[in-house]
Amino acid sequence: MFSEANAKAGVTFPKGFQAAGIKAGIKKSGNLDVAVIYTEKEAAAAGTFTKNAVAAAPVHVSKKVVATHAAHAIVANAGCANACTGAQGEKDAAAMQQIAANALGCAPDDVIVGSTGIIGQLLPMDKVEQGIKAAVKELSVDGSMDAGNAIITTDTYSKAGATSVTIGGKEVRFGIIAKGSGMIRPDMATVLCFITTDADIDGVLLQEALSEVIEHSLNMISIDGDMSTNDMAIVLANGAAGNPKITEKNADYEMFKETLLVLCQGISEKIAADGEGATKFITVHVKGAKSFSDAKTVGMSVANSPLVKTAFFGEDPNWGRVICAVGYAGVPMDPNHTTVKFGGIPVYADGVGTSYDADALRTVMTAHDIVVEIDLKDGDSEAKVWTCDFSYEYVKINGEYHT
């Protein structure tokens, strides 16, 4: 259901949505840095946000919009996070709402704001204002790719996807763009992620669906264990598909939620694979746990371990680092019953390392995509966590990312 064929259409794949991305001069690189996503028809709105206590000004502003369950637009910039900027930062985030509202002909409270970039610097509001106005003039059904490129920072490419499903006899479309490469760990959405759909769904149910989906998708990524001040995932549903409005948790709701999950899991894998300096995409599959929470905790412990991540960069089948991370995760486990496999090859069982085919394991470790399977043999629950390795390039990228 995650369609690469429609990925370029992204957030403008659903009916009634337009987007644009332009160069406002906020990024030192001179690349695209202001994005606008718009629906003339009012949309139900939902969002999840960072749990970092040092939340950025745009997070505060956008939470208020999402609380109304309605919006018309998303405006976002890259190159400056507008975080730790005090009262002026709050005023600037509100000004972004007002500027966009004036240009679009909607109310400021209908505009969600996102920012990403360097912390502690005030937005260059003259550039931001001109950028928003220019982006509104450039809005089109072909603007999703530019919008996606306008929100990235250290990403090597923009992330996008789209899909469709039949709900209530109508084709319902979904689109997504996201940024995320470093400063990613769970506890909300972990990235800037903007989702659109032409489904007709109650705003409260939309929020419930998004919150559940995020827990099983974007919150299952870990690149470097850091949680940003600016993280948010937003979904707008404008009802243009004409499906019978989803007002209860029935079969239509479940279909909607499942499609949203597939979309978000697909984008999560793209984000993890594009970790800063990453050379490996690693899936940590924990099964045999007593609960999803336990499985996730163990998976995150392994995914967050610098020793595990550097071992995979070095293509070293160091199962000791993996079982060590399992052991200190805080989830009760029996090391004599737990098993570990790399690429389907058993490397640890019955409390000791196994005898394995070195050539076969070398093939696993030199591949780009690697699956680490951990079976706790203590229940029926499972979870998949997506991560990447730590390379020399990761240190270089972040060492050179100056304020």
Would you name each region that the model predicts?
Residues 97:
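Generic structural marker for isolated residues within well-ordered, non-membrane alpha-helices
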Residues 1-77, 81-92, 101-403:
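A structural signal for small-residue-enriched, beta-sheet-centric alpha/beta enzyme cores
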